């Protein structure tokens, strides 16, 4: 298997893992991501005094591999689903407890903490520094205090089991997660795939001329998918069909690309000639469908390669159209502000 074929297979496995396994449809059914909800933490979560060096020392004494930090935001439907469906699964919870002490942090918490180097800073600054820009985000730290792996977005039980296999099994020491997925996929029998993506008239057809070295009149959305991806079909059926999403999407130059396509030429925003596979490989996408947003000058301003239902997709489109990134506002902060506006309006 070549490196590029391996990457395509890795994306294929990511799509496969995005679907509920047999018998688990009810447990991993779609949820309303506009709901403002709260989940109770499992009883085995660690009560931390927010000195991560002390927490790591206690994990070492207990014979564990390190720390798992869960970053969430208040009212986050994706966080609740992950906690209720994955972390409260008895077998998954037992494996996490065996290998990691788990600490739950709030992305916007003003409380002070000490990081793994003993530096004092607010939790919210630590979250931003460590790349916890979406909720939920998981950060795994080893006993040496180094980051082992970062996981962004809702993880179904099936996907999270693979994450745990990768980290707890020590594969992060020798393989990137992408290469690990490719290795797992190489052992699976090939399945028949539909010949084409689900097409939508809001997306431009080839030739894909996305060069923005001379500023364009609209922002750009590149949607990476692949044939046979159940999550991609669901995204078209349940999200892209929404009138509000379609109204906002019409204000973008929008293209959909097959992340396995190693032949179709694409003139990228920076003027380079690529194929969809090469571009997806460079971006290191971990989940399909993936939405990558660029401003009028070709600068990437937002990437969402985690599970995204209607509300998060609407917020992503609005974030780019409002140019909130120009004010230094991260996506999760923007989402929180919009949620507070909804609460004040009684919606």
Predicted regions and their residues:
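Bacterial N-terminal signal peptides that target proteins for export
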Residues: 1-10
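Bacterial N-terminal signal peptides
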Residues: 9-18
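Compositionally biased, intrinsically disordered/low-complexity regions enriched for serine, proline
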Residues: 18-19, 27
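Proteins that catalyze or organize thiol-disulfide redox chemistry
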Residues: 24-67, 73-90, 107-220, 224-250, ...
């Amino acid at each position: 298997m070549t490196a590029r074929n391996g990457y395509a297979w890795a994306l294929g496995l990511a799509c496969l893992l995005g679907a509920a396994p047999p018998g688990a449809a009810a447990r991993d059914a779609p949820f309303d991501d506009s709901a403002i909800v709260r989940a109770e933490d499992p009883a085995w979560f660690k009560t931390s005094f927010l000195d991560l060096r002390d927490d790591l020392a206690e994990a070492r004494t207990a014979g564990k591999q390190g720390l798992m930090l869960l970053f969430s935001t208040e009212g986050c439907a994706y966080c609740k689903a992950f906690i209720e469906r994955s972390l409260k699964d008895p077998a998954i919870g037992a494996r996490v407890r065996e290998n990691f002490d788990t600490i739950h942090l709030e992305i916007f918490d003003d409380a002070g903490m000490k990081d793994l180097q003993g530096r004092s800073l607010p939790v919210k600054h630590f979250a931003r520094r460590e790349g916890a820009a979406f909720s939920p985000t998981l950060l795994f730290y080893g006993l040496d205090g180094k980051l082992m792996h970062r996981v962004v977005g809702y993880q179904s039980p099936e996907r999270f089991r693979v994450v745990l296999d990768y980290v707890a099994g020590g594969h992060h020491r020798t393989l990137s997660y992408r290469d690990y997925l490719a290795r797992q996929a190489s052992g699976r029998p090939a399945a028949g795939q539909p010949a084409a993506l689900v097409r939508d008239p809001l997306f431009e057809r080839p030739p894909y001329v996305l060069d923005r070295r001379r500023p364009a009149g609209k922002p750009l959305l590149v949607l990476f998918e692949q044939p046979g991806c159940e999550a991609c079909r669901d995204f078209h059926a349940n999200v892209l069909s929404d009138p509000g999403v379609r109204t906002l999407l019409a204000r973008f130059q929008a293209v959909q690309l097959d992340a396995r396509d190693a032949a179709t030429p694409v003139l990228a925003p920076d003027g380079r000639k690529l194929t969809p596979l090469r571009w997806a490989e460079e971006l290191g996408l971990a989940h399909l469908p993936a939405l990558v947003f660029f401003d009028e000058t070709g600068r990437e301003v937002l990437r969402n390669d985690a599970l995204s239902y209607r509300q998060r997709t609407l917020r992503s489109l609005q974030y780019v159209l409002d140019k909130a990134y120009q004010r230094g506002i991260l996506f999760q902060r923007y989402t929180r502000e919009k949620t507070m506006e909804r609460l004040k309006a009684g919606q």
